[in-house]
Curated annotation (Swiss-Prot):
Protein name: Cysteine desulfurase NifS
Catalysed transformations (reactions): (sulfur carrier)-H + L-cysteine = (sulfur carrier)-SH + L-alanine
SUPFAM superfamilies in UniProt: PLP-dependent transferases
A GO BP annotation: nitrogen fixation
Its job: Catalyzes the removal of elemental sulfur atoms from cysteine to produce alanine. Seems to participate in the biosynthesis of the nitrogenase metalloclusters by providing the inorganic sulfur required for the Fe-S core formation.
GO MF, one example: cysteine desulfurase activity
EC number(s) per entry: 2.8.1.7
Phenotype of null mutants: Fixes nitrogen very poorly; has very slow diazotrophic growth on nitrogen-free agar plates. A double nifS-nifV deletion no longer fixes nitrogen.
Keyword set includes NAD: no
Natural source organism: Azotobacter vinelandii
Modified residues annotated as N6-(pyridoxal phosphate)lysine in this record: 202
Activity: how regulated: Inhibited by equimolar concentrations of p-chloromercuribenzoic acid, iodoacetamide or N-ethylmaleimide.
Length: 402
């Protein structure tokens, strides 16, 4: 029986069509695009086509607004650090408490260097308070960096409105759209977004390639200096094969956009309904009415998410957990804590993230496998007694966060 992969928010498999498009650029069209000979010209033309494909996916006005990078993290760092370098008189950054570590870790570093960092809180559904956000848009803010969609819950933020408010206040706005691109329509030419990050491996393209969208006229300072590549904005010989793959991925993302929002969405809903109909004391986290079509984050109370994942893996199902113990801490993820999910549930969150390759048969299999795994783990849980939770879970195991 084939394995079931439901961890597509972590990475996606590369489309066969994309692999085939990339192969010639390893062994046949291998020239440096900066070279004047035909080998270089062939690659240069292919890069231009890929740039235009990404431009179309993002709805950007100019293909020159597309800068190829190595990954989403590089794009995020470039955007934020550029905004600060271009405006040395401004010392404040606005972000959220639920950002990806690519942004949060950088903001923590900036805070240690003397910058003021405002981290916007979220409510129990992972939503932002726009009035609070607007009150922070002062003359000292250099950049706002807010993710378009949360990688754990799939909750979508009102990015267009937030960008407009920032732009009206004369503040640069950046969004990490790594999870959103290809799943929700984006029309940058009619938005107030100044900078946007994406990465290839969330789009069925290879790892090691990303994009920073930079609106024409936005003040910019390069992170990498050296050659003239990317119009002098990102030095280094282009990763041609991967960029070509990303271009094809952008074309296919447009082709499958409706599929993502209909068929994939329906499978995600079926997965949630099937599990919740059988498993008591479980619920979906995030905003069920405003989220990515492929993401289901389910909290299974009174058990550990990692234990669920290990048992799912034994039966050939790959998912991920929101409760990270990689640092030796028993705390759940920063996203669950920010949403004030009860500790008895936050420790048991599992994220199922689908793709256009996910089948109904695979979803049916997951629906069959999850309930007995949850029951098995609850039978040995200190929080569980018989057919329900103990009277006072806090006495069974003290929470490790307040």
């Amino acid at each position: 029986m084939a394995d079931v992969y439901l961890d597509n928010n972590a990475t996606t498999r590369v489309d066969d069509e994309i692999v085939q498009a990339m192969l010639p650029f390893f062994t046949e069209q291998f020239g440096n695009p900066s070279s004047l000979h035909s080998f270089g010209n062939q690659v240069g033309m292919a890069l231009k086509k890929a740039r235009q494909s990404v431009q179309k996916l993002l709805g950007a006005e100019h293909d020159s607004e597309i800068l190829f990078t190595s990954c989403g993290t590089e794009s995020d760092s470039t955007a934020i650090l550029s905004a600060l370098k271009a405006q040395p008189e401004r010392k404040t950054v606005i972000t959220t408490v639920v950002e990806h570590p690519a942004v949060l870790s950088l903001c923590d570093y900036l805070a240690s260097e003397g910058y003021t960092v405002h981290k916007l809180p979220v409510d129990k559904k992972g939503r932002l308070d726009l009035e609070h956000y607007a009150s922070l848009l002062t003359d000292d803010v250099a950049v706002v960096s807010v993710m378009w969609a949360n990688n754990e819950t799939g909750t979508l933020f009102p990015i267009e409105e937030m960008a407009r408010l920032a732009d009206d206040a004369g503040i640069m706005f950046h969004t990490d759209a790594v999870q959103a691109v290809g799943k929700v329509p984006i029309d940058l030419k009619n938005s107030s977004i100044h900078m946007l990050s994406l990465c290839g491996h969330k789009l069925h393209a290879p790892k090691g390639v990303g994009v920073l969208y930079l609106r024409r006229g936005t003040r910019f300072r390069p992170l990498l200096r050296g050659g003239h590549q990317e119009r002098g904005r990102r030095a280094g010989t282009e990763n041609a094969a991967s960029i070509i793959g990303l271009g094809v991925a952008a074309e296919r993302a447009l082709q499958f956009m409706e599929h993502e929002n209909t068929e994939v969405n329906a499978l995600r809903d079926k997965l949630e309904a099937g599990i919740l109909a059988v498993v008591p004391h479980a619920f979906v986290t995030g905003d069920p009415d405003n989220r990515l079509p492929n993401t289901a984050n389910i909290a299974f109370e009174y058990i550990e998410g990692e234990a669920i994942l290990l048992l799912l893996n034994k039966v050939g199902i790959a998912a991920s957990s929101g409760s990270a113990c990689t640092s030796g801490s028993l705390e759940p993820s920063h996203v669950m804590r920010a949403m004030d999910i009860p500790y008895t549930a936050a420790h048991g969150t599992v994220r199922f993230s689908l793709s256009r390759y996910t089948t109904e048969e695979e979803i049916d299999r997951v629906i069959r496998e999850v309930p007995p795994i949850v029951a098995q783990l609850r039978n040995v849980s200190p929080y569980w007694s018989g057919n329900g939770p103990v009277e006072d879970p806090g006495k069974a195991f003290a929470p490790v966060y307040g």
